[in-house]
Regions:
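Membrane-anchoring hydrophobic helices of lipid-metabolizing enzymes
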Residues: 1-119, 163
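Soluble or luminal CAZymes and related metallo-dependent hydrolases
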Residues: 13, 48, 98, 171, ...
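Residue-level "edge-of-site" marker
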Residues: 35, 69-70, 145, 172, ...
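Catalytic core of membrane glycerolipid acyltransferases/transacylases, capturing the structured
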Residues: 65, 70, 113-171, 196-203
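Short, flexible loop segments at the rims of nucleotide/cofactor-binding pockets, characterized by
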Residues: 92-98, 165-170, 208-209, 265
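Conserved beta-strand termini and adjacent loop/short-helix elements that scaffold enzyme active sites
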Residues: 101, 142-144, 169, 247-249, ...
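Short amphipathic alpha-helical segments and helix-helix/interface helices
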Residues: 103-107, 129, 133, 152-156, ...
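Non-catalytic C-terminal accessory region of glycerolipid acyltransferases
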Residues: 111-112, 134, 161, 173-297
Length: 297
């Protein structure tokens, strides 16, 4: 069964290089450098390129040439996303414009019970916490990454908005404690719904024409703590403009009957997958999925 091994593309050294380039050379020059960086990854990152090619060729049905060209473009856009993220985290938010579609849904959650924001590795959701600072609530981002400790330290140093807190997922499940505390305090928890690691509880559904496996964990947490979920994405629409989407909050019911509970969790996974697929089709270059996702691959 395809599962993620706990490591995203990019590391602390890469993040430091991005920040240095932004501070000393500017965003435009950093974008120019990406032309060559993206080409390097296109040539030498065989495993991630294979998965991305499969996505464009077999799922989106692009021609072979178009699929290969879009693999390169995907790396380039991913680099832009990282640069934008650090520009905003480092205090350059004024260089970007954005429209918020569904901000009132998050405001509703923040003013009532708090809740869970379920996103994916698409677009640039990490910047949403900085853009949504006017919600006047803390946003906690779960980081599912093997390098989370070092990245957390570095991100903490460069972030301007301290209302964004990174919670690294731990093997001993000790991350449940800060999650519980955050939800008790009516804060927001943001976590990805398109990744899972081995031994995670999952469900198999139809996704973009093929069978795929999604985690039920985010929805189980919502049911356990009695808080609503919303699906949210922050998508790059032009060089310096982003569009934020958030769906109406919904409550995941908690049942004593295991069979009923599993059906409820699967129902919400399918809802998320449906919205996720809609966003992917609108912004096909911005899904940064660098591992085997579909079972047929």
């Amino acid at each position: 069964m395809p599962s993620w091994k706990g490591q995203s593309r990019g590391n602390v050294l890469g993040y430091k290089i991005f920040v240095f380039t932004l501070k000393h050379l500017g965003l435009s020059f950093a974008y120019f450098i990406l032309v060559f960086v993206a080409f390097y990854y296109f040539l030498f990152s065989n495993k991630s390129s294979k998965s991305t090619y499969y996505y464009f060729r077999e799922i989106l049905k692009y021609s072979s040439f178009k699929a290969k060209w879009n693999v390169y473009k995907n790396y380039f856009v991913f680099g832009q996303i990282l640069l934008d993220k650090f520009a905003i985290l480092g205090g350059l938010k004024g260089k970007f414009s954005y429209n918020l579609d569904g901000e009132h849904h998050l405001r509703q959650m923040a003013s009532n019970t708090g809740g869970i924001i379920i996103n994916a590795h698409i677009g640039n959701f990490e910047i949403a916490g900085q853009l949504l600072e006017r919600l006047n609530t803390k946003i906690n981002v779960l980081m599912l990454d093997a390098e989370h400790q070092n990245i957390k330290k570095y991100l903490t140093n460069v972030m301007v908005n301290r209302d964004v807190q990174i919670i690294p997922i731990q093997a001993d499940y000790s991350h449940i404690v800060p999650i519980s505390e955050a939800l008790i305090n009516k804060e927001l928890i943001a976590m990805a719904g398109d990744r899972f690691i081995e031994e995670s509880k999952v469900v198999e559904i139809d996704f973009m024409g093929q069978k795929a496996v999604f985690p039920t964990g985010p929805f189980y947490l919502a049911a356990r703590f009695g808080v609503p979920v919303t699906f949210a994405f922050a998508m790059k629409e032009s060089r310096t403009h982003y569009h934020f989407f958030a769906s109406p909050p919904e409550k995941v019911e908690r049942y004593k009957d295991p069979e009923k509970q599993e059906k409820e969790l699967k129902r919400f996974v399918e809802k998320f997958a449906c919205e996720f697929e809609r966003i992917i089709k609108m912004y096909p270059l911005q899904w940064f999925n660098y591992y085997q996702f579909w079972k047929e691959e």
